[in-house]
A protein has these predicted regions:
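Coupling/switch segment of ABC-type P-loop NTPase heads
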Residues: 1-88
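Switch/communication elements of ASCE P-loop NTPase nucleotide-binding domains
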Residues: 77-83, 87-275
């Protein structure tokens, strides 16, 4: 429909009012059911103590949320953090302490030594902020049904309850430049991190990135998982924004390569620099 018809909403009169109401209710239901999380980039220098009232510090808020959720060792969210902080070479374990009810200190264990997270590199600070936020999101998507009942799965009747734990299914995490301050080898691991959260916890992502390494690894995952082989569904969708304010979708082939080409100044920039050096 032409946008001119809806310049002042009078264009709605061309539709059946009952249909408009129905579509609006469907839209409202999906929006109300949608659970959104935001993970921003962590670029500021950190202090050893994180104030519980610091609403401008993304890492401090991530630590505060984790503490408030009362996640204990042995819970899947805690194990998730340990697994990925090792994968990103941050450390082997962590300890969170609250000081006088006013601030937290976050201690990283590396072999037989301990150090404040704030004293580590900015890459470690960035990735721990992301991992903590993801762990909190995973925890918040779960809720407990205290009644008994049943549901059908694979043509089988499954009884549940009481205290049956279920997970919300309409969750989106928005991530801003997750590659900030990370070594290229670690940037590529971000694809595995987000992919695991999607597969294991049914959580979707909307990611803004300039990282070639992250995107390249999604291509490898698509190939290895055969996501472009029917009847599989590819969970990855890449939209490229060109410098000239144009955008287009990047579709994967079965071998993981893209059908479309990126604009100038992205994947070809390294090649252009090498040519100038020759």
């Amino acid at each position: 429909k032409s946008n001119d018809k809806f310049a002042n909403l009078r264009g709605l009169k061309i539709f059946n009012p009952e249909n408009v109401k129905t579509y609006f209710n469907i839209f409202k239901f999906n929006v109300d059911d949608l659970l959104l999380f935001y993970v921003g980039s962590c670029a500021q220098k950190q202090s050893a103590l994180f104030s519980i009232r610091d609403t401008k510090n993304i890492l401090a808020q991530s630590i505060h949320d984790y503490f408030q959720l009362n996640i204990s060792p042995g819970e899947e969210e805690h194990d998730f953090i340990i697994k990925w902080m090792k994968e990103f070479e941050v450390g082997d374990n962590f300890k969170l302490e609250i000081i006088s009810g006013e601030a937290y200190q976050f201690i990283i264990s590396i072999v037989n030594s301990e150090t404040h997270l704030a004293d580590m590199g900015m890459g470690s600070v960035q990735i721990m902020s992301i991992i903590l936020r993801l762990a909190c999101a995973i925890k918040k998507t779960k809720y407990t049904v205290y009644e008994t009942g049943s549901y059908i799965s694979d043509d089988k009747i499954i009884d549940y309850g009481p205290n049956f734990e279920v997970r919300k299914s309409n969750i989106v995490i928005m991530v801003e430049e997750p590659e900030l301050n990370l070594h290229p080898a670690l940037q590529s691991k971000l694809a595995y991190l987000f992919h695991e959260v999607y597969v294991n916890f049914n959580i979707s992502f909307l990611i803004e990135t300039h990282s070639e390494y992250l995107i390249r690894n999604t291509q490898l995952i698509v190939k290895e998982s055969e996501y472009e082989v029917s009847p599989n569904v590819n969970p990855f969708c890449v939209i490229y924004f060109d410098q000239e304010s144009k955008k287009w979708g990047m579709n994967y082939r079965g071998d993981g390569k893209f059908i479309e080409e990126f604009g100038s100044g992205f994947f070809n920039e390294t090649r252009n620099i090498i040519k100038q050096m020759m």
